[in-house]
Amino acid sequence: KTCGSLLSTVTRQHTIPGLLFLDSPGHAAFHLMRKRGGNLADIAILVVDSQEGMKEQTLESLRILRQYKTPFIVAFNKIDQFAGWRSNNNIALMQSLKDQRDDVQHNLDTKLYTFVGKMSEENFQAERFDRVSDYTQQIAIVPVSAKTGEGIPELLMVVTGLAQKYLEQSLQTDVKGPGRGSVLEVTEESG
């Protein structure tokens, strides 16, 4: 439903059983939760504030994802906060980007490619999702606004496509076999 009209442009059938999202807070106090999440995840979405770029928690998350060889994409969030941004969540992200004024597009590209440069310093090749030439070599960055919903369909399409292409076998489930789960955090309360 969220991907809407984007699904009609895809000719390949989706075969993965679904996606489960775990939200690991970015605050420094949640280091252990991020580490456990990075260890257990089949694929990750690293949410980055486009206005702030690379922060210490971002670097930590990148290192965790590398350590556990977890494939990931970047959601470059808060694009609606660029000065002059005209939100329109009723059209595809690429059309919305084209409809922005030149200075707004330039500011977004400047922030995005500054972040790409910081990723390169950490030995990650990254590119805006529509410019990725090889998803096995480059990290896709999808500009999004969690507030307006812009870019969310594209983000879901990219993560679904990557999961289907590279993780389809590991995402298979045996509904007749035993279940398996992981506890990320336990809080003991008396009373």
Q: What do the PLM-derived regions correspond to, one by one?
A:
Residues 57-64, 111-118, 154-162:
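Alpha-helical scaffold elements adjacent to nucleotide-binding pockets in ATP/GTP-utilizing enzyme cores
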Residues 10-15, 35-40, 64-69, 134-136:
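Conserved catalytic network of the ASCE P-loop NTPase/AAA+ motor domain
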Residues 42-48, 69-82, 93-103, 114-120, ...:
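Conserved beta-strand/loop subsegment of P-loop NTPase cores
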Residues 18-19, 28, 39-59, 67-85, ...:
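Conserved Switch II/interswitch segment of TRAFAC-class P-loop GTPases
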Residues 2-11, 30-36:
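Conserved alpha-helical scaffold flanking the Walker A/P-loop in AAA+ ATPase domains
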Residues 13-33:
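Switch II (G3) loop of P-loop NTPases
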Residues 1, 124-191:
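Conserved catalytic-core segments of large NTP-driven translation/proteostasis enzymes
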Residues 33-34, 58-59, 84-90, 154:
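Short acidic, glycine/serine/threonine-rich loops at helix termini
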